[in-house]
From Swiss-Prot:
Binding site for ATP: G393, E394, P395, D417, T418, F419, W420, Q421, T422, D508, R523, R534
InterPro entries with a match to the protein in the record: Ac_CoA_lig, ACAS_N, AMP-bd_C, AMP-bd_C_sf, AMP-binding_CS, AMP-dep_synth/lig_dom, ANL_N_sf
Catalytic activity: acetate + ATP + CoA = acetyl-CoA + AMP + diphosphate
Classification via PANTHER family: ACETYL-COENZYME A SYNTHETASE, ACETYL-COENZYME A SYNTHETASE 1
EC number: 6.2.1.1
Source organism: Coprinopsis cinerea (strain Okayama-7 / 130 / ATCC MYA-4618 / FGSC 9003)
This protein's record includes keyword ATP-binding: yes
Cited PROSITE patterns: AMP_BINDING (PS00455)
Keyword field: ATP-binding, Ligase, Nucleotide-binding
Top-level taxon of origin: Eukaryota
Record family assignment: Belongs to the ATP-dependent AMP-binding enzyme family.
Protein name, UniProt field: Acetyl-coenzyme A synthetase
Gene: ACS-1
Length: 661
């Protein structure tokens, strides 16, 4: 695993943070160190209680700060406390400054967006909450949300939270089959969707996809449909209800339901190494606190800032840093419906200039794409409002980091390369803009309350000191850690708590350099990270195997200049399947479409190789390690092949890959 000690010189604290008009929340490394010690020490409960009272409104006080352990899988934070996430994110700011912008909605077509005030957001949230109640939704019920990037998606989240319903948001790029599986798994009674979506100038058939999924979801009684484009869509009378018509029939205020701190707030599905998506459950109090804390401290957000996370609300990044984090501290958040290059590669920077955004949080894939298209698209815009630039989804490579720093940040903005996961709920390793010098590619230091431990993979021994590399774990529970996998607590324990008892297992490798900075080294399990999306190799293999001609398949991830990793698939065919070798491209296209249909476009393999056999041990285990080495151009480093049932197949595959290059 080790590539030798990491030696990278740090970059100084950014000028716009250090010498700007706003004093950073954490302004010196000594301040960071003392607070971090306080949050992991014997009296850390005092710090957490103080922050919980500072940042959140509690309807019912808590007396216990935390209980439970990794070993028992019974973690709880502020268990006696009662609160409502919707009230914390909307009502208190609507009462304090009703006309303040809550959401900047930048629609797909330039000029069609608008700003939504906290007062308007409160009315919409309450109206949708009352609509859901009229459908019979009550506390503890699950509502699925399959919406494009419209501002009403935020209202849907918060309407569920307001009445104590659990929202399960499904990314609107997922297929009908993926949506069906998630609705069935979480037992949804209601689906919220739209007639269509818009992205990059193209229509997305959201309602048609939802209808295909609903054919096998008889438990779904009502479908609330947002009119986004107004184009004709399939309709089922008695089940389907237009959003705007339903809102017109209900009261404009809905009192918030007081929820226990440990009541579920949402379920969000993430890829697992077994192929079956995991419904990760986050609870109300601890999750909301960490969302608020991290957006405030990691991005150095102040009350009049305008925060922009360019993710989709269908992923955890959107949940935490479009919806709950910014709104929990009463600042302006951004919903960006389009793509970085529509209608021109200046779209991001036009948006920054137009709304005077102060923080900008995006993925390395987007940064690499825009770098490739040229900095002239950036340089013609006034980006002087920006103070902090963020990166999320995967470690940002140094070339992209330097471009981001020089052309977007003008070498004056802080860059925070953040590490976290769906399961962590919020950022766990990150620079602090006013206190931590950064290194391109390094996640740097743990957030408050996070005590990372790098373990030797085989023995589980803690690797002390610097210049070490191993498996990244976390030593103690923190408030926003996921509490379970929906309907399968044993799988939760087996996945995160059992691999290294006493530690939370992230599934990522990590190194600690000579300065104690943490570097994320990528997945150590069978999960691929494509453009920040975690994809299970087993899930993609399962999609490929449904093709009538496929006998076996092996999927790997390999480095990709644009997307970080790309999906490559090796496929063997059934003997009886009639296949013309001259038409391999046609079959590959069929297989790619199969994956797009079953999972979604983002999971489509970049390359498919039709081969006569796969490298297997005598016991039948497919050696994906060998395939990864061949694709990476490291065929001379395959190591011992004596355990293979047919070592000769390696040469066949090498020739296949070389000829297709």
């Amino acid at each position: 695993m080790s590539e030798g000690p990491i030696r990278v010189a740090p970059h100084p604290i950014a000028k716009r943070v250090k010498h700007g008009c706003k004093t950073p929340h954490v302004s010196h490394i000594d301040d960071y160190r003392s607070q971090h010690r306080e949050t992991i020490g014997h009296e850390s409960d005092k710090w957490w209680a103080k922050k919980a009272h500072e940042l959140l409104y509690w309807d019912r006080p808590f007396h216990t700060v935390r209980s439970g352990s990794f070993e028992n899988g019974d973690i709880a934070w502020f268990p006696e406390g009662g609160l409502n996430a919707s009230y914390n994110c909307v009502d208190r700011w609507a009462f304090k400054h009703p006309e303040k912008t809550a959401i900047i909605y930048e629609a797909d077509e330039p000029g069609e967006g608008r700003e939504i005030s906290y007062a308007e957001l409160l009315r919409e949230v309450c109206s949708i909450a009352n609509v859901l109640k009229s459908f019979g939704v009550k506390k503890g019920d699950t509502v699925s949300v399959y919406l494009p990037m419209t501002w009403q998606a935020i209202a849907a989240f918060l309407a569920c939270a307001r009445i104590g319903a659990i929202h399960s948001v499904v990314f609107a790029g997922f297929s009908a089959e993926a949506l069906r599986d998630r609705m069935q798994d979480c037992k949804s009674r209601v689906l919220i969707t739209s007639d269509e979506g818009r992205r990059g100038g193209k229509a997305i058939a959201t309602k048609a996809i939802a209808d295909a999924a609903l054919k096998e979801c008889p438990a779904v009684e009502k479908v609330l449909v947002l009119k986004r484009t107004g184009n004709p869509v399939p309709w089922t009378e008695g089940r389907d209800v237009w959003w705007h018509e339903a809102v017109a029939r209900v009261p404009r205020y809905c009192p918030p339901e007081v929820m226990a701190s440990e009541d579920p707030l949402f379920i969000l599905y993430t890829s697992g190494s077994t192929g079956k998506p995991k419904g990760v459950v986050h609870t109300t109090g601890g999750y909301l606190l960490c969302a608020a804390l991290t957006v405030k401290y990691v991005f150095d957000v102040h009350p009049d800032d305008r925060f922009a996370c360019m993710a989709d609300v269908g992923w955890i990044t959107g949940h935490t840093y479009i919806v709950y984090g910014p709104l929990a501290i009463g600042v302006t958040t951004t919903v960006f419906e389009s793509t970085p290059v529509y209608p021109t590669p200046s779209r991001y920077w036009e948006t920054v200039e137009k709304y005077k955004l102060t923080q900008f949080y995006s993925a390395p894939t987007a940064i690499r794409l825009l770098r490739r298209l040229g900095h002239e698209h950036v340089n013609k815009h006034d980006l002087s409002s920006l103070r902090v630039l963020g990166s999320v989804g995967e470690p940002i490579n140094p070339e992209a980091w330097h471009w981001y720093n020089e052309h977007v940040g003008k070498t004056e903005c802080a860059i925070v390369d953040t590490f976290w996961q769906t399961e962590t709920g919020s950022i766990v390793v990150t620079p602090f803009p006013g206190a931590i010098e950064t290194k391109p590619g390094a996640a740097t230091v743990p957030f408050f309350g996070i005590e990372p431990a790098i373990l030797e993979p085989t023995t589980g021994k803690v690797l002390e000191g610097n210049d070490v590399e191993g498996v990244l774990t976390i030593a103690h529970p923190w408030p926003s850690i996921a509490r379970t996998i929906y309907g399968d607590h044993q799988r939760y324990l087996e996945t995160y708590m059992k691999p290294y008892p006493g530690y939370f297992y992230t599934g990522d490798g990590a190194a600690r350099d000579e300065d104690g900075y943490i570097w994320i080294k990528g997945r150590v399990d069978d999960v691929i990270n494509v453009s920040g999306h975690r994809l299970s190799t087993a899930e993609i293999e399962s999609a490929l195997i449904t093709h009538t001609g496929v006998a076996e398949t092996a999927v790997i991830g390999t480095a990709d200049e644009l997307t970080g990793q790309a999906v490559y698939a090796f496929v063997t065919l059934k003997p009886e399947f009639k296949f013309d070798p001259e038409n391999e491209a046609g079959l590959s296209k069929e297989l790619i479409l199969q994956v797009r249909k079953i999972i979604g476009p983002f999971a489509a393999p970049k390359r498919i190789y039709i081969v006569s056999d796969l490298p297997k041990t005598r016991s039948g285990k497919i050696m994906r390690r060998i395939l990864r080495k061949i694709v990476a151009g490291e065929a001379d480093q395959l190591g011992d092949l004596s355990t293979l049932a047919d070592p000769g197949i390696v040469e066949v595959i090498k020739e296949k890959v070389a000829s297709a290059a």
